[in-house]
Amino acid sequence: TPSAGDSEAPQAGTSATAAKDCFNWGYDPLHFNAPEGSYASDAADGANRIVELRQMVMALHNTGLRVGMDVVYNHTSASGQHAQSVLDRIVPGYYHRLNANGMVERSTCCDNTATENLMMGKLMVDSVELWAKQYHIDSFRFDLMAHQPRAVMETLQRRVNKVTGRHVNLIGEGWNFGEVANGARFVQASQLSLNG
């Protein structure tokens, strides 16, 4: 019988892992759908990353814990023809938000993505659907969610609820700043527009 997630044994395990788990927290996104290698016994083996992450989530669920995932879709680690740029190598200048001079916006301190563009918004929605459906992630915390259009986040919420058959909690930073502040480019998924 699994114990409650807030009971002593699961909490001790969570605390022990948190104390030794020190990595970059994923704020330099490269491949949105690739499981983090540091959680696998062999990070170089892509299939192993997938299998072991699924096993980890299942084990946590079996102890009564739910799994939340921190996601960063507001920027990537690089753009243009940089070695760590992925999206610009597919369609240059489309997946990143550009300023009037054609330069990539960097208000997030990295290369901002343009989820207001149809296919970048779709990439984000499809990615969260994958994590919720295939990995059984229970909730998602969005870094700088106000850099996403409210309409895209609402589409995302409906989609993940539908494919999982349950309500998936979405939590986000609704800060109003940068080139998207005050609805400059779209109605933001911000604290102001979400009445929170």
Describe these PLM feature segments.
Residues 1-3, 71-80, 144-149, 172-177:
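Short, solvent-exposed turn/loop segments enriched in Gly/Ser/Thr/Pro and often Arg
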Residues 2-62, 77-122, 126-134:
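Aromatic- and acidic-residue-enriched carbohydrate-binding clefts of CAZyme catalytic domains
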Residues 60-67, 134, 160-167:
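Secondary-structure transition/capping motifs at alpha-helix termini
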Residues 67, 71-72, 123:
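Short alpha-helical catalytic segment bearing the HExxH-like zincin motif
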Residues 67-69, 140, 170-172:
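Hydrophobic faces of well-ordered beta-strands that scaffold small-molecule active sites
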Residues 115, 141-144:
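Active-site rim elements
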Residues 133-141:
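Short, surface-exposed connector motifs at secondary-structure boundaries
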Residues 144-196:
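Active-site-proximal helices and loops of the catalytic beta/alpha 8
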